[in-house]
């Protein structure tokens, strides 16, 4: 690099003073500046140009110095970052403990320097189970022919006894009972039973008894005392229980007495099994004296209240009474029917069965 100095007449003219005298010669630079090649003191121009030329190198030098400082600080930071060791655990190292145990075992096995024999280590001997000792001997051997106790090994243990199954106790398991009957069939069975019980009434027929029953039920429906018919299989079983326990054939000498006793049973059945709270007395009363009617009701209540309550609470007892009612019709069919009026009874039973429809009532209970 070098400095080029150009001279022109204008510059020389400008450099002259007004008096025509030339400007003073510039002072020579010092020896140090010459050694630097003339860069030590740059020429001073108009308007302070020399000062700006002096400032530019200083800016460059400061930038280079800043870069060097930044690089040096970065190196120091990298050098200061060291891996921190893990804190030592409070307990001993398991690997060290294992090595120590191995060394102790080796020292115990090796004989000491002064001589002597090391004691053998105790080794557990496996025990053979009894089942494994009774395996088959090899072919050609005579171990199988040895009797027990001759040194051939212990005999195999006897097999455990088989559990004995107790024989079924008769009557212990419940017996399934299936009873199926329709409303018309049960009405006919009830009529047959009353006709056989009242043997003194020769002109009585099952249809007449069924007519009394249907007349009371129809009257209560027409008067508005009940919304649905009372004649159902369950209610017929209840009426049969009352008639069986209250009607006495030797005490009933006329059809009027039988009708009064039968309507008393119906009144109690309606009171116990009916859907209404109370029923009128007029459809059930056929005699002028009401006292006799109430006396019969009280006697039946005192005698049969436990059985009536049991019939509603115990399904097995109900099934038994239901089966007894059905057997009454079978007994009448096998015995030839009532003593008199067999043909009218059969025709009335057929009409009742047709009126009741083909629906059957089935019970399936275990007893």
From Swiss-Prot:
**How is this protein positioned relative to the membrane?**
Lipid-anchor
Superkingdom of the source species: Eukaryota
- Compartments it resides in: Cell membrane
What molecular functions are annotated in GO for this chain?
Answer: actin binding; cyclin-dependent protein serine/threonine kinase activator activity; lipid binding; protein kinase binding
Tell me, which GO biological process terms does this entry list? axon guidance; brain development; cerebellum development; hippocampus development; layer formation in cerebral cortex; neuron migration; positive regulation of calcium ion-dependent exocytosis; regulation of cyclin-dependent protein serine/threonine kinase activity
Which segments show compositional bias classed as Basic residues? 74-84
Could you list the residues that carry lipid attachment of the N-myristoyl glycine kind. Answer: 2
Q: Which residues carry this modification: Phosphothreonine?
A: 84
Q: Where is this region: Disordered?
A: 1-56, 72-98, 131-175, 329-367
The UniProt regions of compositional bias labelled Low complexity, in chain numbering, are: 131-148, 342-357
> One GO term of the cellular component aspect?
neuron projection
Pro residues: compositionally biased ranges:
154-171
Biased composition annotated in UniProt, kind: Polar residues? 1-11
Q: Which UniProt keywords apply?
A: Cell membrane, Lipid-binding, Lipoprotein, Membrane, Myristate, Phosphoprotein
- Share the record's PTM remark: Myristoylated. The Gly-2-Ala mutant is absent of the cell periphery, suggesting that a proper myristoylation signal is essential for the proper distribution of CDK5R2 (p39).
- Which Gene3D superfamilies does the UniProt record give? Cyclin-like
Family according to the record? Belongs to the cyclin-dependent kinase 5 activator family.
Q: How does it assemble?
A: Heterodimer of a catalytic subunit and a regulatory subunit.
Physiological role: Activator of CDK5/TPKII.
What is the protein name stated in its UniProt record?
Cyclin-dependent kinase 5 activator 2
């Amino acid at each position: 690099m070098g400095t080029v100095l150009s001279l022109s007449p204008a510059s020389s003219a400008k450099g002259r003073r007004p008096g025509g005298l030339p400007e003073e010669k510039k002072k020579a630079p010092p020896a140090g500046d010459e050694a630097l090649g003339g860069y030590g003191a740059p020429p001073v121009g108009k308007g302070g140009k020399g000062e700006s030329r002096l400032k530019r190198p200083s800016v460059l030098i400061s930038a280079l110095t800043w870069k060097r400082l930044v690089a040096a600080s970065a190196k120091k930071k990298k050098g200061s970052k060291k891996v921190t060791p893990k804190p030592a655990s409070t307990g001993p190292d398991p690997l060290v403990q294992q090595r120590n145990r191995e060394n102790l075992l080796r020292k115990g096995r090796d004989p000491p320097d002064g001589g002597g024999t090391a004691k053998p280590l105790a080794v557990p001997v496996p025990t053979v189970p009894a089942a494994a000792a009774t395996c088959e001997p090899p072919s050609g051997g005579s171990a199988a022919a040895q009797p027990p106790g001759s040194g051939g090994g212990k005999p195999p243990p006897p097999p455990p006894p088989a559990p004995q199954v107790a024989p079924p106790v008769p009557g212990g398991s419940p017996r399934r009972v299936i009873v199926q009957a329709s409303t018309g069939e049960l009405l006919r069975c009830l009529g047959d039973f009353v006709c056989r019980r009242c043997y003194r009434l020769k002109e009585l027929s099952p249809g007449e008894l069924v007519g009394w029953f249907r007349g009371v039920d129809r009257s209560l429906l027409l008067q508005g005392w009940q919304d649905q018919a009372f004649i159902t299989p369950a209610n017929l079983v209840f009426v049969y229980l009352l008639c069986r326990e209250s009607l006495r054939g030797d005490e009933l000498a006329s059809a009027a007495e039988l009708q009064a006793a039968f309507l008393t049973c119906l009144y109690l059945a309606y009171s116990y099994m009916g859907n209404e709270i109370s029923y009128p007395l007029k459809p059930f009363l056929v005699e002028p004296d009401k006292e006799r009617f109430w006396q019969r009701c009280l006697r039946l209540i005192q005698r049969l209240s436990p059985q009536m309550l049991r019939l509603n609470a115990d399904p097995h007892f109900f099934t038994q009474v239901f089966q007894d009612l059905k057997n009454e019709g079978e007994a009448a069919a096998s015995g030839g029917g009532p003593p008199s009026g067999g043909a009218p009874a059969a025709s009335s039973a057929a009409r009742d069965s047709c009126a009741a429809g083909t629906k059957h009532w089935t019970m399936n209970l275990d007893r």
